[in-house]
Amino acid sequence: MLYIELAWRNLFRNTRRTLLTCLLISTGLAVLIFADGAIRGMEKLMIGSVTKTLQGEAQINRLGFRDNFDVDLYIENPTTILGKLTEDERLSAYSLRVLSGGMIGSAYNSAGGVIYGINPEQEKEVSRIRDAISEGNYLSGKSRELLIGTTLADLLEVKLGDRIVLTAANVDTNELTQDLFRISGIFEFGAREFDEGFVFVNLSAAQKLLGMEGGIHQIVLQFKDPKTSRDNLSLSYQDLEDKEIEITGWLGLQPSIGAMLEYTNLGTAIIGGILFILISLGVINSLFMSIYERIYEFGVIRAIGTSRFEIISLVLVEAFFLGLLSAFLGLIVGLLFSYYYSINGLPLGEMEVSGIMLGNGNLYTELAPYQVIFLPLYVILLTLITAIYPAFFASRIVPTRALQRAL
């Protein structure tokens, strides 16, 4: 109890120095909490923007389809797979798709692109296509409806209600087939790849165009917990009868995002290292100045029989209080900033990752329990570790030299 009282009194013998040191350490902790929240928010933003734009959190395809998108590699009878998906309580939604490269033509121009056949009701649960409609209406289920990107619409010189001819190869005969559609909606994802190269029609119309009645190329999955779909899910559905099925999580679909996530973790480690340097410099400077101011005091208590261990304990308790006070202040400031930007967001402007625009241009920080518990403990522990050397220095003060120096 005596050590605690002495350490607390010694801490405020020079209030200005103590407050400056607290300001340094608490600022470092506040920055660490805010930066960690921003990094977590960036991770969520990147994953959400990629998976909710069009790709989905996971996909089921015929083995080899994703290598070159060969239209002949399709799932002829998805009934068994759909039965398994219906029973899976982890899923929140899924959507069936047909994909094919083809020609997209108007009365004025033509261009190559990707034709997507989708189920409108299912698709709105797994992608942002409905939310991306800038003109007109989303697909309602009528066979001749078509959605086109803004850039492609400008290239073909078409508008709402105009006719579009789609040309694609039949999956069985490889003969070219054509069908006529009308533009019901124009979408804008913000990514040139999507707005210039994709069109969407109803699933049944695409199946008819390609001659694959009942067949599909892709099933897009959405999970209640996105962590479920991080890696490949083959083991989860290994009892499927069709062994030619490939199930891929979002990390397999977008390896570049995985690499970016590793860099964000590295960023947190770098910030933690910088914080360690700041704390070390601040604590060592503060404690050494405090020790030199009390050189006579240490000489006296050593002369009356105080052990080295007791002096070490006194300095470490003082450092603990310094770390505790700094951690409390840094925690309050860091949480206030993180909470504010978790509501209002940090404006990013137009930022693109893997060809996909990140959300609505705002980064929202993410709060987590470990930021409240472990990061302040990390700061207190660093303060104690840094104080070990000054504590040992104080314990080795020779009483006679200390008294002579004081005189």
Regions found by a protein language model. Give the residues of each.
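N-terminal Sec/SRP start-transfer signal
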Residues: 1-33, 43, 48, 52, ...
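Mechanotransmission and gating elements of multispan inner-membrane complexes involved in transport
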Residues: 170-268
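Hydrophobic secondary-structure segments that place a key small or acidic residue at a functional site
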Residues: 97-98, 113-118, 132-204
